[in-house]
Amino acid sequence: MSDTTILQNSTHVIKPKKSVALSGVPAGNTALCTVGKSGNDLHYRGYDILDLAKHCEFEEVAHLLIHGKLPTRDELAAYKTKLKALRGLPANVRTVLEALPAASHPMDVMRTGVSALGCTLPEKEGHTVSGARDIADKLLASLSSILLYWYHYSHNGERIQPETDDDSIGGHFLHLLHGEKPSQSWEKAMHISLVLYAEHEFNASTFTSRVIAGTGSDMYSAIIGAIGALRGPKHGGANEVSLEIQQRYETPDEAEADIRKRVENKEVVIGFGHPVYTIADPRHQVIKRVAKQLSQEGGSLKMYNIADRLETVMWESKKMFPNLDWFSAVSYNMMGVPTEMFTPLFVIARVTGWAAHIIEQRQDNKIIRPSANYVGPEDRPFVALDKRQ
């Protein structure tokens, strides 16, 4: 195998990263997404992420991924109406959520809630495309309800009504979290961040969902597997760690001095670099503008200025660029989102991409079963039980 990979329909050469297993190895075909073909680009079904983030609401992108096309104005209105009607939780799902302790990891709550929903509203035999899309829409509409019903009950003993009349998924999330409708600015910020997180080709959680789908398993099982993969700190959770880093410091100068020492000591700084992008993460420029606007509106540029300074430091010292997580941490923090909910928000966005990949994998209708390079001992003589030492 060559030590470089030339992506199809592109002259851009990507060198596989030694720290990432199977880096640069194509593991299947997809018509859903391209990542880093030119080193710093991202497309969903052929549409540039910069155009989608600038012009689309999240529900438009969800429709693009799950239902295969950007909706017309009438189709978007009908889709939003459908999603609003799907925000409620069955009684037994609420009962399951009420049994989970407050100390539960929110990602475990998401996984358990989806499993309970799958037991209550299981996928029908036959696994039709229309049925899978309906389940995807139900999950998209109700994941915020699952998370925040548990959160308020476990922390305050309050049984909230998870149905709201908010126009968007992001608005619904913020309304349930804070108990009031969010500002237009916050709702717009959520639209953008969810669009940016919605899809990213064969990342670990998406590939997990495709492996499960390839076995002929149900939609819920594939989504649950993806949530489990995203729970791992090497995949999801980078924005949570990014905020922890930023909150260590009181000033940009203090942050710069400490990070330069850590870089000299070969410490890894989470929030920088990417397994696929080689030039820059195209999502970064978008979320950075969002973070700055939210910080200005909130009357505090402290976290933004620290994050901005460290962006400069990491480029000067390591030639490492920030990824989406670095300034999404600032954005979510400015909207009052608890740090432990950053990765669940990732789930709410990415369920659209996961669902699209599951549907696509089913159409391929092949089980995924790669081979392994055996590195163990060969031709060992068998030793009888009584003679082993």
Curated annotation (Swiss-Prot):
Binding, substrate: K82, H200, R283, R350, R369
Binding site for CoA: V268, V269, I270, G271, F272
EC number: 2.3.3.5, 2.3.3.16
Catalytic residues identified in the record: H235, H274, D325
Catalytic activity, reaction form: propanoyl-CoA + oxaloacetate + H2O = (2S,3S)-2-methylcitrate + CoA + H(+); oxaloacetate + acetyl-CoA + H2O = citrate + CoA + H(+)
Pathway annotation: Organic acid metabolism; propanoate degradation; Carbohydrate metabolism; tricarboxylic acid cycle; isocitrate from oxaloacetate: step 1/2
Thermal activity characteristics from the UniProt entry: Optimum temperature is between 45 and 50 degrees Celsius.
Gene Ontology CC annotation, any one: cytoplasm
Family that this chain belongs to: Belongs to the citrate synthase family.
Binding partners and assembly: Homodimer.
Protein name, entry field: 2-methylcitrate synthase
Native source species: Escherichia coli (strain K12)
